[in-house]
UniProtKB/Swiss-Prot annotation:
It comes from Borreliella burgdorferi (strain ATCC 35210 / DSM 4680 / CIP 102532 / B31) (Borrelia burgdorferi). The gene is ftsZ. NCBIfam families: ftsZ (TIGR00065). GTP binds at G30, G31, G32, S33, N34, G117, T118, G119, E148, K152, D196. InterPro entries: Cell_div_FtsZ (IPR000158), Cell_div_FtsZ_CS (IPR020805), FtsZ/CetZ (IPR045061), FtsZ_C (IPR024757), Tub_FtsZ_C (IPR008280), Tubulin/FtsZ-like_C (IPR037103), Tubulin/FtsZ_2-layer-sand-dom (IPR018316), Tubulin/FtsZ_GTPase_sf (IPR036525). Pfam families: FtsZ_C (PF12327), Tubulin (PF00091). This is Cell division protein FtsZ. Signal peptide: none annotated. One of its GO terms (molecular function) is GTPase activity. The lineage of its organism: Bacteria, Pseudomonadati, Spirochaetota, Spirochaetia, Spirochaetales. It is found in: Cytoplasm. The keyword Cytoplasm applies. One of its GO terms (biological process) is protein polymerization.
């Protein structure tokens, strides 16, 4: 295990006057719009939300403050009919509107469910606009469940290839992979809801590191250095319970990711979030970070966050986003932990959130890390917070 040092900082709430970074999230199509709605419902703050759709009726039901009706001339507000070429034409029709709404952003997240008409066709157009504006652009998209048919999967892959050309970083979550982390009682409705939740988690986990200000600050430049021009990214979720919880959580996060064809080995940038109970120790954090970073590039930059959730008993959750791979086809991590499949209840816990998420950044140098970190504490009782994990006592109110 590689050693590293930590420098703690004092807790401080977000202050918009000292963190001027402008983040925007745009959901394209039905899946993207649903994901944006979930983010708003979960209380993701200090982010501007936009939805863009060809289906006017669906657009009107969105709770996003900014709604873009795409392609009135092309679709008459009736949707793209599952045809990406229609979604693309609709976005191109209103490209000036898209540009106006993205203008001024430092970072844009584009979220969509790939395989349909609007999201698949419009997302690459939106990404190209953001690229032309010089905005750091991250795509967070899903691929269809297998039961949705081979045609939809083929369309999704074509759309992803188009999107990849314009985004800096692309996180692709195959919905089918969700079936490996839930139990057999999961309903179809819940499956799609959880797909939306994973999109939300990917966006707010990254955004939270930027918008939450600490005394020793992780600024936009830190995250930009990890995300800019990095291509496909890995997103993994791990869980551990009992005596070996730290090892199990860390290892399962990097060996059972919700992502195809990408492994953590050789990555040059990491975003890591760890959540444990009141008994979560510094040594466990060190153990987790050591397991996760042992296979990354020697010059890797690691931005981490850890949360204390008093409702967790003897449990640890780990989420990892990794970027900067030399190849998409990396050798799999050989060790496989026990109990690395989440139950439906555990996955619901992971999809919730947490109100205490201190974060930090490491620069790996030989066998040690030079660290700068920030701690964040949230005190808002009325809305949820922009971190991976929300307090469990709010879970019941969302179901």
């Amino acid at each position: 295990m590689k050693d590293y040092n930590m420098i703690d900082s004092h807790t401080r709430r977000f202050d918009s006057t000292t963190n001027p970074t402008i983040l925007k999230v745009i959901g394209a199509g039905g899946g993207g719009s649903n994901a944006v709605n979930r983010m708003i419902e979960y209380g993701v703050r200090d982010v501007e939300f936009i939805v863009a759709n060809t289906d006017l009726q669906a657009l009107q039901t969105s709770i996003a403050p900014i709604k873009i009706a795409l392609g009135a001339k092309v679709t008459a507000g009736l949707g793209a009919g599952g045809k990406p070429e229609i979604g693309q034409a609709a976005a191109e029709e209103d490209i000036d509107v898209i540009r106006n709404h993205l203008s001024g952003a430092d970072m844009v997240f584009i979220t969509a469910g790939m395989g349909g008409g609007t999201g698949t066709g419009a997302a690459p157009v939106i990404a190209q606009v953001a690229k032309e504006l010089g905005i750091l652009t991250v795509g967070v998209v899903t691929k269809p469940f297998k039961f949705e048919g081979p045609k939809k999967l083929r369309l999704a892959e074509q759309g992803i290839n188009n999107l990849r050309k314009s985004v800096d970083t692309l996180i692709i979550i195959p919905n089918q992979k969700l079936l490996t982390v839930v139990d057999k009682r999961t309903t179809i409705k819940d499956a799609f809801k959880r797909a939306d939740d994973v999109l939300r988690m990917g966006v707010q986990g990254i955004a939270g590191l930027i918008i939450e200000h600490g005394e020793v600050n992780i600024d936009f430049a830190d995250v930009k250095s990890i995300m800019q021009g990095q291509g496909d990214a890995l997103m993994g979720i791990g869980y551990g319970k009992g005596e070996n919880r730290a090892v199990d959580a860390a290892t399962s996060a990097i060996s059972n990711p919700l992502l195809e064809e990408v492994r953590i080995e050789g990555s040059k940038g990491l975003l890591v979030n760890v959540t444990g109970g009141d008994d979560f120790s510094l040594l466990e954090l060190e153990e987790i970070m050591g397991i996760i970073t042992v296979s990354v590039d020697d010059e890797a930059t690691v931005i981490y966050g850890h949360a204390i959730n008093s409702n967790l008993e003897d449990e640890i959750y780990v989420t990892v986003v990794a970027t900067g791979f030399a190849s998409k086809k990396q050798k799999e991590i050989s060790s496989t932990p026990e109990n690395n499949t989440l139950s439906s209840k555990e996955f619901d816990t992971l999809m919730s959130g947490n109100q205490n998420a201190p974060s930090g950044s490491y620069e790996q140098q030989d066998s040690s890390f030079a660290a700068k970190s920030k701690n964040v504490n949230y005190f808002d009782d009325d809305i949820d917070v922009p971190t991976f994990l929300r307090n469990l006592n709010k879970k019941s109110s969302d179901d």
